[in-house]
Structure formats: C-alpha cells, structure tokens
C-alpha cells in the first residue's frame, strides 16, 4: 500500500520457523549475522542478506562492495562488507550441522523450562506452530541484579546482553 519493503532481522533466528515457513523468508529481504557468538558463527565478523528481488539483490551487493556495481564505478556511497573465503568456508562446514545444533539448543531449553519451577522466575514460552532456535535463553525476574548475583554464587554465568537498548 505504501511501497515499503519488509526487511527481516534474522541475526539470531536462523533455523527458526513460523508454521513451517523459515524465518528469513517472510519479508522482501532478510539480514543474517554470522558473528562468532551467533547460532552459526564464523571465525570473525560475517553476515549475509537474502532476497528473491533481483534489483534489491544488486543494490545490496553494490553497497557491500564500496557502493560499486562494477570495478571503479560507484553508484552508492558504500562499504567494504564482502565476506572473505575463510569465513565462507567455515560457515559452509557449520551449515551442515545447523539442524543438529538447533536440536541441542531446543533440548537444553526444554530442560531449563521444565526444571526452573520458581514463581519469581518467568521462563520463555513458544507459541504453537513456532520453532524457536534459542540463540539465548532469557528469563524475567523482578530484581535482575540480585538474581544474577545468586546465579553467580551457584556457578551459573549470566549476562545482560543489551544493558541499554541499542535504539536508546
């Protein structure tokens, strides 16, 4: 209606599905992060954009190549965001094990959810028809800092991923 594109942030959801449809295939394009801490991590910074729109693909490819659509011809103010061969080779190997890794995280999350039985701890839920790939297992509590101290005393590491939301 307004000519807007839907671009999915699929940085932490590779392997997730909504009613059988893979995340990353729901919009006009999707951005994937392969930072080492992600579900499928490269050796260093890496990422990808997927789309079935050939003109959008050409624009993204040019932006990632200094804004150039061909050698020494810049059509945009771009960046150097090309993935090198070592990152691609590592990801190619890891991709073969993605489903196995997703199942391990799903099983671990199930163990957490079925054994954390305290009224002060709200565990995550998954809606019917959804497949969660558990990049993180996040719980909600009233006093985060006290809870983190308690877990630390029990030898359980925790982290606050975004102490200040990125948009703030």
Predicted regions and their residues:
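Catalytic PLP-binding core of fold-type I/II PLP enzymes
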Residues: 1-20, 53
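Proline-centered loop/turn at the N-terminus of a beta-strand
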Residues: 3-5, 22, 29, 157
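Short clusters of hydrophobic/aromatic residues that line enzyme substrate/ligand-binding pockets
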Residues: 14, 23, 40, 79, ...
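PLP-dependent aminotransferase class I/II
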Residues: 17, 52-168
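Short Gly/Pro-enriched turn/cap motifs at secondary-structure boundaries
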Residues: 24, 37-39, 127-129
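Short aromatic/hydrophobic contact patches that present stacked aromatics
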Residues: 31, 48, 136-138
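Glycine-rich phosphate-binding loop of ATP-grasp-fold ATP-dependent ligases
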Residues: 39, 43-48
